[in-house]
Amino acid sequence: MPHLDEEAGPVELPLGKVVGKRWKVVDKLGEGGCGAVYLVEELKTQARAAMKAESNFVAGGSVLKLEVQVLKRMRGRKWASCSTHQCRWVNSIGRSITQFSGKKDRYSYMVMTLFGASLSKLFKECRRSFSVSTQIRLGLQILYGLKQLHEVTFLSITFSSLFSLSREYVLRSGGKVEIRRPRDNTLFRGTTKYCSANTHTRAEQGRPDDLWSMVYLMAEMRGPLPWDQLRDKHEIGATKNKTTDEQLLEHSPPELLKITAHLRSLDYFKRPNYKLIFDILLATMLSNNIKYSDPFDWEIRGVSVSAGKNKVNKKVSRIATVSEDKSVDVKTMEIPSTDNKDQKTSEEVPLGERPPFTAQDMEKNELGF
């Protein structure tokens, strides 16, 4: 058996290698601390997919196995794309999970749907600035994706399409499911730039923390975050705490302040009101004349990102000033109501102009807590 230190790095698969008698390695797409992602081609159909390979000799055990578990939970859910081959967990000679043994094989892998460019890459191509139209529509997709993940009892933690640090926030016993009790002092887990201010205090992360990450990401779509140039996680945490919601969302539609006000009303145990956040984002679309079928910024050829629907409609609502303790009564804050008779509801907006998921999708509470 290879020594642990010799095999703990990213898995290197030569181009042309056939894995599991089915997948031929075509190109290397990227790598991390203990894994690598490859472009592969199925021998029989020439269909292309992404393969993530992970060393079996990584201290702390497999994280790929957790990713597969999350993807299996997501299988069959609306608008969720898990894996090209049912998230099957296999080792380097193609056996199923019941026969898996990390002691006998150098690496493990899973084959997944091949997607296009990452959002990070598209953001860079757009000179690190998205229009309000793109910002809000991406926010809707992120919101629904997080809700789906929360419904299958996992938190995102790293806020990425990979689930290597995801954590289940419930306990299952005797056929019952209940939320875990929060720990007093946890390890710092997450992406420093986007994790919630709460995470910096080593407090237990819950569903609201994932949504704070969403808000930070949406804010960055319109301009650099206040801590963008900082590298020390303690300094970043301190800056997050002293940044007001108005400062954070300075270049975003003012309606988004109602989202942060709602998040500040939550604690670890409280379920976020996904429907409320959905309504806020939808109202922002309507007030800024944004159609869901509009092209995203990266789809527009020869047009500056600053053109078109990039300016915030500051006249559509009046947002109350957030106090220094950042606690705001959500009911006192005004945004365009989706119940207004002169304003279309999500169901009245023509297909192609509204999101592919509905208010009912956002309101559904599968866990009951």
Question: Whereabouts are the PLM-identified features?
Answer:
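A conserved loop-to-beta-strand element in the N-lobe of protein kinase catalytic cores
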Residues: 104-113, 120-121
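Juxta-kinase regulatory segment immediately upstream of eukaryotic protein kinase catalytic domains
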Residues: 1-18, 26-27
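Conserved beta3-strand ATP-binding lysine motif
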Residues: 52-56
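Short beta-strand micro-motifs within the conserved protein kinase catalytic domain, predominantly
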Residues: 83-93, 97-108
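Activation segment/activation loop of eukaryotic-type protein kinase catalytic domains
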Residues: 160-192
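Conserved N-lobe ATP-binding subsite of Hanks-type protein kinase domains
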Residues: 36
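Activation segment signature within eukaryotic-like protein kinase domains
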Residues: 138-139
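Extended, low-complexity, intrinsically disordered C-terminal regulatory tails
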Residues: 244-251, 278-279, 286-369
